[in-house]
């Protein structure tokens, strides 16, 4: 049975993390920023599972499950906050939220 090399896991993980980071920095829509954050968290999961596969330990999978639970909680709370902001102020972008201060 062929095994996937650790470099493949880490390369895919770095690419996905970079795309997520670019989405967080470049996008202004709140939902898109939240989705980019989820992409970055999933990239970390891929790196952890790849390291677990390479080292033969279970800690990577345990941490990945913890991050999945954390990401689900973060998505639920984040979407709730985004919906509340939109209902109160009719704001969709991060620039408009900065203007609401004061």
Curated annotation (Swiss-Prot):
Enzyme nomenclature, EC number: 7.1.1.-
Signal peptide feature range: none
Membrane-spanning intervals of the chain: 6-26, 30-50, 66-86
Reactions mediated catalytically: a quinone + NADH + 5 H(+)(in) = a quinol + NAD(+) + 4 H(+)(out)
Domain of life: Bacteria
Bilayer disposition of the protein: Multi-pass membrane protein
InterPro entries assigned to the protein according to its UniProt record, in alphabetical order: NADH_UbQ_OxRdtase_chain4L/K, NUOK/Mnh_C1-like
Record keyword NAD present: yes
Electron transport is among the record's keywords: no
Gene Ontology cellular-component annotations: NADH dehydrogenase complex; plasma membrane
Family the entry assigns: Belongs to the complex I subunit 4L family.
Record text on subunit structure and interactions: NDH-1 is composed of 14 different subunits. Subunits NuoA, H, J, K, L, M, N constitute the membrane sector of the complex.
Name of this chain's protein: NADH-quinone oxidoreductase subunit K 2
Organism: Aquifex aeolicus (strain VF5)
Gene designation: nuoK2
């Amino acid at each position: 049975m062929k095994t996937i090399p650790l470099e493949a896991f880490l390369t895919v993980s770095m690419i996905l993390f970079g795309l997520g980071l670019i989405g967080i920095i470049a996008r202004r829509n709140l939902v898109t920023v939240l989705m980019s954050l989820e992409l970055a968290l999933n990239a970390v999961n891929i790196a952890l599972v790849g390291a677990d596969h390479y080292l033969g330990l279970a800690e990577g999978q345990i941490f990945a499950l913890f991050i999945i639970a954390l990401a689900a909680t973060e998505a639920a709370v984040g979407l709730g906050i985004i919906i509340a902001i939109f209902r109160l102020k009719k704001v969709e972008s991060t620039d408009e939220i900065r203007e609401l201060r004061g």
